[in-house]
């Protein structure tokens, strides 16, 4: 399988500071296989050879996947139309989540790509509770309390664009909150 676009998206996430250090993780589904970033990896420096592979039941076929593997698996198992997941710790979305503030969809892009945001309470990273609560969301753009965001798509480009738009509206909400009355 050609993973060049997968790697390109990982690098974009890092270059645009939606992830820092070893934070965040990305996966794509191809039939019964999940291609996912490895644990402890820095997305900006990943190569195709680094990508881990698991089947839809969670059997690891290659590498040591991210600790959030269960979350990715549960989403794919519950949402057949989803083929890509992006999880970041983007700064503005995470700040709003820590303050329990909801975001307003302020732009046409947000109305088109995001439509509605789900909010999930805090659960420990990598926990089954986090996986179950995120996978139960109907929405494809999910803000995790004190933890970041998860965006879902039919492909990795769609999931990435949702990440980009969600972080932009968080920034706009911040600006408007500080310029407004």
Curated annotation (Swiss-Prot):
UniProt: Zn(2+) binding residues: 68, 87, 89, 147
The protein's enzyme class: lyase
GO biological process: pentose catabolic process
Gene Ontology molecular function: any one: L-fuculose-phosphate aldolase activity
Keywords: Lyase, Metal-binding, Zinc
Cofactor binding mode and count: Binds 1 zinc ion per subunit.
Catalytic activity entry: L-fuculose 1-phosphate = (S)-lactaldehyde + dihydroxyacetone phosphate
Zinc recorded as keyword: yes
Pathway(s) where this gene product acts: Cofactor biosynthesis; coenzyme F420 biosynthesis
InterPro entries per UniProt: Aldolase_class_II_sugar_metab (IPR050197), Aldolase_II/adducin_N (IPR001303), Aldolase_II/adducin_N_sf (IPR036409), Fuculose-P_aldolase (IPR053406)
Binding site for substrate: 24-25, 39-40, 66-67
Cofactor(s) demanded: Zn(2+)
Keyword Lyase appears in the UniProt entry: yes
One GO cellular component, as annotated: cytosol
Active site as annotated: 68 (proton donor/acceptor)
Pfam short name (any one): Aldolase_II
Entry EC no(s): 4.1.2.17
Quaternary structure note: Homotetramer.
Task of the protein: Involved in the biosynthesis of the coenzyme F420 which requires phospholactate produced via the aldol cleavage of L-fuculose 1-phosphate and the NAD(+)-dependent oxidation of (S)-lactaldehyde. Catalyzes the reversible cleavage of L-fuculose 1-phosphate (Fuc1P) to yield dihydroxyacetone phosphate (DHAP) and S-lactaldehyde.
Family statement: Belongs to the aldolase class II family. AraD/FucA subfamily.
Protein name per UniProt: L-fuculose phosphate aldolase
Organism: Methanococcus maripaludis (strain C5 / ATCC BAA-1333)
């Amino acid at each position: 399988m050609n993973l060049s676009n997968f790697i390109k998206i990982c690098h974009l996430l890092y270059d645009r500071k939606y992830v820092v250090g070893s934070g965040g993780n990305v996966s794509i589904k191809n039939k019964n296989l999940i291609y996912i970033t490895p644990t402890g990896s820095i997305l900006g420096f990943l190569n195709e050879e680094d990508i881990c592979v698991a089947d839809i039941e969670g059997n690891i076929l290659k590498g040591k996947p991210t600790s959030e593997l269960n979350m990715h698996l549960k989403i794919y198992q519950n949402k057949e139309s989803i083929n890509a997941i992006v999880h970041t710790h983007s700064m503005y979305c995470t700040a709003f989540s820590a303050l329990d503030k909801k975001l307003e969809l302020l732009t046409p892009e947000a109305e088109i790509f995001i439509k509605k945001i789900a909010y999930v309470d805090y659960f420990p990273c990598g926990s089954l509770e986090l996986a179950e609560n995120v996978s139960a969301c109907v929405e494809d753009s999910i803000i995790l309390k004190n933890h970041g965001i998860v965006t879902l798509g039919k492909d990795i480009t769609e999931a990435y664009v949702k990440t980009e738009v969600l972080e932009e509206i968080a920034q706009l909400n911040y600006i408007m909150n500080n310029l407004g009355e």
